UniProtKB/Swiss-Prot annotation:
Organism, as annotated: Chlorobaculum tepidum (strain ATCC 49652 / DSM 12025 / NBRC 103806 / TLS)
GO molecular function per UniProt: DNA binding; excinuclease ABC activity
Subcellular location: Cytoplasm
SMART domains: GIYc, HhH1
Assembly notes: Interacts with UvrB in an incision complex.
Keyword DNA repair: yes
Functional summary from the UniProt entry: The UvrABC repair system catalyzes the recognition and processing of DNA lesions. UvrC both incises the 5' and 3' sides of the lesion. The N-terminal half is responsible for the 3' incision and the C-terminal half is responsible for the 5' incision.
Originating gene: uvrC
Lineage: Bacteria, Pseudomonadati, Chlorobiota, Chlorobiia, Chlorobiales
The protein's name: UvrABC system protein C
Family as reported in the entry's similarity comment: Belongs to the UvrC family.
């Protein structure tokens, strides 16, 4: 691919030379633009003058990719910051926003799940695939959802954490708005919803869970053992027994963790495997000598960027994006450039809760070198997988011109391999439902279809319906169950598209959204005043129509079933003593009204009780003796 902008003219070069002559020596961020005014590179510097001038003073000695970039620089702008840490953070934000062509792109696998502890008086703990800056604590990401579910099960078996979604404000609890559920009666929750557990006691439990998730099992076991001994001395044997059960569960968990170091310290291990234009970085999270997790990030558009620079980009990205405890030691595959190392030191220092120096080591022999080698092997493995997937995506694009066409039409950053489409259905404002169908590689994936019975509003309100459906898919329990799509498609026009986009923004999700309006088959995207009109023969339009029609079919089918069920229930609820719940029980047990009508009194009694059973029997057998 070549730059569409022409090379800078003499006037531009003269203006650029003047800017180079007046550059400050402060730390900050610089932006290079081409003749069209497009930002093509963003960088940070400890000394802006020295760093920016180095691009122009060393022409002829630069790597190929850098030399090409410099030939297209027509303008530059700098932002002075008060520290290298500020420059590092600003650079990261600008690269995300501007997506400059010559910057290395770092992409985490956003479909990986995290464990979240919510920022509430009585926090909830669950799996999510979305990291939001909402004050909640996030742990992960976990490469396997099954691994995370095991941890959630462990936490649930040891700690009585609430599973409800109630908003337990002081006012709500004091007013007696909520009642304890089954979890309270089977000792899996202590009933904070009814004020049976104090906020202080609950938060103390959350601190223990955080200690566990940070890999500090030894410290937690010591604290719990001391507490157990204390309760036993106070003759509080029931509480001591509960603590003993917690301790035994923790010991079983600790035994399953892989010991990778004889030193019981905290360290993060980093390595990068590089290919021709792609790379992969892996970090091992080691706590108390045990490997508690790993994470990998893909780096693309790397060109011939030196390995130390790639490693620095990966490490900086990790600590900027991951809300995690800073360890005592960082083990690196290679020495970082001095300027990058100093910026990283300052960043880690600013994020530490304890005042201590983080050690940087580049081991060559022994146990630590073995850890680096193991980390690098994993990076090579993930890079190989990435290259295979990249090749496969290319083959999919060749075999499915519709996906490639759709990518071009909607200006998507990647091939829309996974598309989710929403459609609403109702009858005169009743039985409002929404459907979501999923296409993967241009074909339906019915196991990922979902349907929603909408309840958050009354009457006919298509915008409220779309808001509820999109919120429940991307903000509810499904957010952790299904991977995020490459494109969200709405069966509707500009208004519904904007509603869906607003919901995603509120949830902190940057997902492409488009809508297909029925009448003229126009394509709407958020914040665009005019729709796109594609030829009727367009492969992209045909794919969108197929998605829209399938979502409509799925919604209509579900809506008809609900209406049918309601009609059937109405016949049963017309019988004296049969309410909505009894009708649902009867239908669930017998399968149909006809089967209910043929049942004996004894059979009906097993489901609805003797008195109601006699009433039902008389209704269907009028004139017959029971």
């Amino acid at each position: 691919m070549s730059d569409t902008a022409a090379a800078p003219d003499k006037t531009a070069k003269s203006a650029l030379a003047e800017k180079l002559a007046t550059l400050p020596t402060s730390p900050g961020v610089y932006r290079f633009s081409n003749a069209a005014g497009t930002v093509i590179y963003v960088g940070k510097a400890r000394n802006l003058r020295n760093r920016v001038r180095s691009y122009f003073n060393s022409q002829g000695r630069q790597p190929g990719k850098t030399a090409v970039m410099v030939s297209h620089i027509a303008d530059l702008n700098v932002i002075i910051t008060s520290s290298e840490v500020e420059a590092l953070i600003l650079e990261n934000n600008l690269i995300k926003e501007l997506k400059p062509r010559y910057n290395v792109n770092l992409k985490d696998d956003k479909s990986y799940p995290w464990l979240v502890i919510t920022n509430e008086r009585f926090p909830r703990i669950f799996l999510t695939r979305q990291v939001r800056r909402d004050g909640s604590l996030y742990f992960g990401p976990y490469t396997e959802a099954s691994q995370l579910r095991l941890i959630l099960d462990l936490i649930g078996s040891i700690f009585p954490v609430r599973s409800c979604k109630y908003k337990l404000t002081e006012e709500a609890v004091a007013s007696g708005r909520y009642r304890v559920c089954l979890d309270y009666h089977i000792h899996k929750c202590k009933g904070p919803c009814e004020g049976l557990q104090s906020e202080e006691e609950y938060q103390a439990m959350i601190r223990e869970i955080v200690t566990l998730l940070k890999g500090k099992t030894s410290a937690l076991l010591r604290d719990l053992s001391a507490e157990m001994q204390k309760k036993a001395k106070e003759l509080k044997f029931e509480e001591a027994a509960a603590l003993k059960a917690q301790i035994e569960g923790l010991k079983r968990y600790a035994e399953r963790q892989k010991i990778v170091s004889t030193e019981a310290i905290d360290r993060d291990v980093f390595a990068v495997a590089a290919g021709e234009d792609d790379a992969c970085g892996v970090v091992f999270r080691i706590r108390e000598g045990k490997l508690i997790g790993s994470r990998h990030t893909y780096l693309s558009n790397t060109g011939n960027t030196p390995l130390p620079n790639l490693l620095a980009s990966f490490v900086e990205h990790y600590y900027l994006e991951t809300p995690d405890l800073i360890p005592q030691e960082l083990m690196l595959q290679a020495e970082l450039p001095e300027e990058e190392l100093e910026a990283l030191r300052q960043l880690l220092s600013s994020r530490q809760t304890e005042r201590r120096q983080v050690r940087f080591t580049v081991p060559r022999i022994g146990e630590k070198a073995h850890l680096i080698a193991m980390c690098l092997d994993n990076a090579k493995h993930h890079l190989h997988e990435f290259m295979v997937q990249k090749k496969l995506r290319g083959e999919i694009a060749r075999k499915s011109p519709a996906l490639e066409s759709l990518k071009q039409v909607l200006h998507l950053g990647k091939l829309p391999e996974r598309i989710e489409c929403f459609d609403n259905s109702h009858f005169q404002g009743t039985d409002y439902v929404s459907s979501m169908v999923t296409f993967v590689s241009g074909k339906p994936k019915k196991s990922d279809y979902r349907k929603f019975r909408l309840k958050s509003f009354e009457g006919s309100d298509d915008y409220a319906a779309m808001r509820e459906a999109v919120t429940r898919r991307y903000g509810g329990s499904l957010a952790g169950e299904l991977p995020l799509p490459d494109l969200v498609l709405i069966d509707g026009g500009k208004g519904q598209v904007n509603v869906a986009w607003q919901v995603l923004q509120e949830l902190g999700l940057d997902l492409p959204v488009a809508g297909l309006a029925k009448r003229l088959e126009e394509i709407y995207v958020p914040n665009e005043p005019d729709p796109y009109n594609l030829p009727k023969t367009s492969p992209a339009l045909k794919l969108l129509q197929q998605l829209r029609d399938e979502a409509h079919r799925f919604a209509i089918t579900y809506h008809r079933k609900l209406r049918s069920d309601r009609t059937i229930r109405t016949e049963l609820t017309g019988i004296k003593g049969v309410g909505e719940k009894s009708a649902e029980k009867l239908l669930k047990h017998f399968g149909s009204v006809e089967s209910v009508s043929k049942a004996s009194i004894d059979e009906l009694s097993a489901v609805a009780g003797r008195k109601t059973a006699e009433s039902i029997y008389r209704y269907f057998n009028a004139g017959d003796a029971p």
